[in-house]
Amino acid sequence: RGTPQPPPRLRSLSIRGCAPGPPHVPCVAVLCMEGENTALWTQCGSDTSYQLLDGQGPWRLVSVPNSTSFALHDHRGDVTLFSPTLKPTPLDPLLSFCPTLHILPAEHEGTWQASRRTADGSLLAAHRVLAIVATSFTCTDHLLIWTTHAHEAMFVPLTCLTTTPQVSQLSRRVERGSRIVTAVPSAMSLVLQMPRGNLETTYPRPMVLDVIRDRLDRLAFGEALRVSRAHRVDLNLLHDHCPTAFLERVPEILAQIHHVDHINLLLSNLRNEDVTQSLYRPWDASTRAPMAHLDTKVNQICDRFLEAMQAADERYYLSSILTAHVRKVPADYESGLRVLLKYMHTDMALAEEACKYIIFLVNADQLYHVALGMYDFELALLIAQQSPRDPREYVPFLREMRAKEPLAYQRFCMDDYLGRHAKALAWLAQAGSEHTEAAMTYMVQHKLFREGLVAWAKDWLFYPSP
């Protein structure tokens, strides 16, 4: 509103969004007809200019990546760069007008060059050959994309045009004869036209990863997670892209993600692997050093999340806390069951729901044995009730175990059932003198002589009289 309107007969339009820095100033450039002549109308904020161009054309406006600038390409092949803050700057001229022209970064920072595709399929930037046998091309603010006669779409970062790192090209197969129409970086999509004329939208992995890495660099972990879920990207990338920043901001990550199901998904996908060295290698592999302490990666992340969730709201994050315990390497089932045990005494309904969830994560028989190893019959009964176990099997067993006395003998029977013979011997040694002979036999049977010496080390009955 209140913006001067350009003449109605448009030829070409370039909208470059907002000038950098506050206040955000929209910049627009329009080619329009003025009688038999062509005029260039530009506006950046409140500054408006209007000038007639020399010649009949053709003319073309070209956007400049990562900039509010634009370029004007005329019928003679000349390319002129226009900027809201600088005077018009001529670039290296082309031999003739080129309908497929893009402006790319040049070798020196802050300079630009015109790129084009020649009749023989060569992709050129000024006089430098970027690719051969290219059938179409385009660029985004970060990527140069082209298709080849081998029916592949190729992707390289624009930074390779200003520096000479050993970057790797990424590619994906496309349908035979596909041509690029446009790339939409915000949607992570590449629009292709098929030989039969129809348009198809694809979501190439390089464009998706480019957006995810950008979100992670801006510490927008919640957005990065949503994009990763939508495009089935390994969630380990959220940590592996920058481990230090991730571990230092776990409370912030919880606030951004918030939904416990998404937190559970993130924790469940953790593994001791650096995906930036395997699945999603960076453009320049030399910039990435091997991750330190890779074998403890999962445990470090789980510990940080446990600390943050327990401090924030343990009840709300209960399922995520259980997930963090069982995802450790090795899994810490006992700590997870202790959390469950705490809620059994305060909120049985919540404890039952949590029990169903942890059984979903872990084999029920394994959890049942862990609960028995904790010598808690109520916990073992709860797990057995939520599992497919037959009550005719576990109810008499638990009743029999609970009836054994004294407590040390009861725990001996439990550990013996679980195959923990060293612990069983220690309990049997404490069960009283009436079980001493049985303990000796048990020690010999399982060859636990060292454990026997420890168990009876302070019992004077086993020492000779002076």
Predicted regions span which residues?
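Extended alpha-helical solenoid/arm regions of large eukaryotic scaffolding proteins
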Residues: 1-466
